[in-house]
Amino acid sequence: MTPSPSSTLEAPPADAARERSSETPVLGFEAAAVMSRIDALAEKHEGHDDAFRSAMAQLLKAELVKAREVAQAELLAERHGRRTAERLCALHDAIIRILYTAATRHLYHSHTPSDSERMSIVATGGYGRGLMAPESDIDLLFILPYKQ
């Protein structure tokens, strides 16, 4: 089966690295702890979406830098590029799940969303193949609910 050029959060995992639970730390990145910090930021910036987005972006960028340092150290120690690329993709999976959770929990919250009120995230490129180079970026398309 040929990998799709895009991936969604609801798509089945591409490989073993993507099957990791969101609770399993990847490259030192602890998703549950980061999500707790984001929830605290949302509470602190309640009613100020721009300030919340900025604070969340700063937090996630700092966590990404730390995780990339861990990835580099693991790559140099293990000398296994594909494994590192898979781990980086799993890291990005965790970050995208956090972004989705933060957006649906704090920015576009709906207690009982209908089909037309659900947000979708679409990614393209190497991310869809489950492999990320160390300095790769991800092109994401957030498809927002028609009611905002």
Describe every region a protein language model picked out.
Residues 2-117, 135:
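N-terminal regions immediately upstream of nucleotidyltransferase
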Residues 120-148:
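Catalytic metal-binding acidic patch
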